[in-house]
Regions:
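N-terminal Rossmann-like NAD(P) cofactor-binding subdomain of oxidoreductases
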Residues: 1-197, 202, 297-300, 344-345
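Conserved active-site and cofactor/substrate-binding residues in soluble primary-metabolism enzymes
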Residues: 11, 80, 127, 148-155, ...
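Predominant activation on well-ordered alpha-helical scaffold segments within soluble catalytic domains
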Residues: 17, 154-158, 210-214, 264, ...
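Generic secondary-structure signature for well-ordered alpha-helical cores
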Residues: 21-25, 162-166, 207, 215-222, ...
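Short, solvent-exposed beta-strand edge segments and adjacent coil->beta transition regions
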Residues: 139-140, 197-199, 239-243, 306
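Short Gly/Pro-enriched turn/cap motifs at secondary-structure boundaries
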Residues: 201-205, 233-235, 282-286
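Oxyanion-binding "anion nests"
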Residues: 206-229, 233-237, 241-243
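C-terminal active-site/capping subdomain that shapes the small-molecule cofactor and substrate pocket
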Residues: 242-345
């Protein structure tokens, strides 16, 4: 197979290149800049110092050439880009895995409200599918890869809704992300003197992944209307920890065993989700892997459920899940080419 990557020089793009380079079914990777014309020759080893031995040229963007030369294309670009570029791929039913947020929300008004950018045409949004790989196989050729916070949060909450265990108005999510989740571009919050030995709460109840999370949770339980969602930047390079709190629907008949059974049943056979029998996961447990690790607890005194969900934001939260979606689309084993052992320590 031949794969194209548009936007390889960002953090998600470089992670994607790393994974695809070790994929046994990928024989050729072609790299494209976002610009169509007027760019001087650019080479990956000059753009990303870690890839100094990689001589691939970044080619000017050309949708026709991408489709003629490749079997699949990955877009690892910021929001607001693929909404303008998707049309020829959708018209030709060409496989796309889009790591941006442009096709995750099905309501154009919701996208424009949360992303502050023009939305893709509604007919194009309807031609795409949401690639939550541990629950769905792609049913269209245009796959919207889930966001990092959304992935950790949805996987952490799913059994609570699918098993109808909680009071829907009690859901609280406290999510924390490493600095790579903010992207490659330097901001004041990601500046070393600011984030080092610090924790920064940002976008409380206004993060663009909130409507994405709710859109998916409604598929698990259509009666859910809202959740309390906060995001904190922490001084680690990669990783997300989502701590989820909720109240059981029937506290009198609820127990920790009820909770454990629900998670074991929902995630039975799902290769990329690991439910701990005891204790809680830590970010280090999943770094450089495509796993989501989950631990649960129940406090009988306060009648409160606690769930901890951790992922690597650049792998399971971006490039790894994108490759998992590609594997599913082409009928490969979903773990094909994905790192099966996390890095430790």
């Amino acid at each position: 197979m031949r794969a194209a990557v548009v936007g390889v020089t960002g953090y998600s793009g470089t992670e994607l290149f790393r994974i695809l380079s070790n994929h046994p079914e990928i024989e050729e990777i072609n790299l494209y800049a976002r610009e169509k014309e007027g760019i001087s020759k650019r080479f990956l080893n000059k753009e990303v110092s870690a890839f100094r031995n990689i001589k691939n040229e970044l080619l000017p963007y050309d949708a026709k050439e991408i489709m003629e030369r490749n079997d699949v294309v990955f877009f690892a670009v910021p929001a607001g880009v693929t909404s303008k570029l998707a049309a020829p791929f959708i018209q030709n039913d060409f496989p796309v895995i889009d790591l941006s947020g442009d096709f995750r929300l099905k309501d154009p008004k919701e996208y424009e409200k949360w992303y502050k950018k023009p939305a893709a045409p509604k007919e194009e949004l309807e031609a795409s599918c949401y690639g939550l790989a541990d629950f769905y196989k792609p049913d269209t050729s245009y796959i919207a890869n889930p966001g990092c916070y959304a992935t950790a949060t949805i996987l952490g909450i799913a059994p609570l809704l699918l098993k109808h265990l909680i009071k829907l108005d009690s859901l609280i999510v406290d999510a924390k992300s490493g600095v790579s989740g903010s992207g490659k571009k330097l901001t004041e919050n990601s500046h070393y003197p600011v984030i080092n030995e610090n924790a920064l709460l940002y976008k409380i109840n206004s993060h663009q992944h909130v409507p994405e999370i709710l859109q998916q949770l409604k598929k698990f339980d259509s009666e859910i209307e809202a959740l309390q969602f906060s995001t904190t930047l922490i001084p680690v390079t990669r990783g997300i920890m989502a701590t989820i709190y909720a109240k059981p629907k029937d506290a009198d008949g609820f127990s920790l065993e009820t909770l454990k059974k629900a998670y074991a049943e929902v995630y039975h056979g799902k290769k990329c989700v690991r439910v701990l029998e005891e204790g809680f996961p830590q970010i280090k447990d999943v770094q450089y892997s495509n796993y989501c690790d989950i631990g649960v607890a129940y406090d009988e005194l306060s009648k409160t459920i606690s769930v901890v969900s951790v992922i690597d934001n650049l792998v399971k939260g971006a490039a790894g899940q994108a490759v998992q979606n590609m594997n599913d689309y082409f009928g490969l084993d979903e773990l094909c080419g994905l790192p099966k052992v996390p890095a430790w320590p």
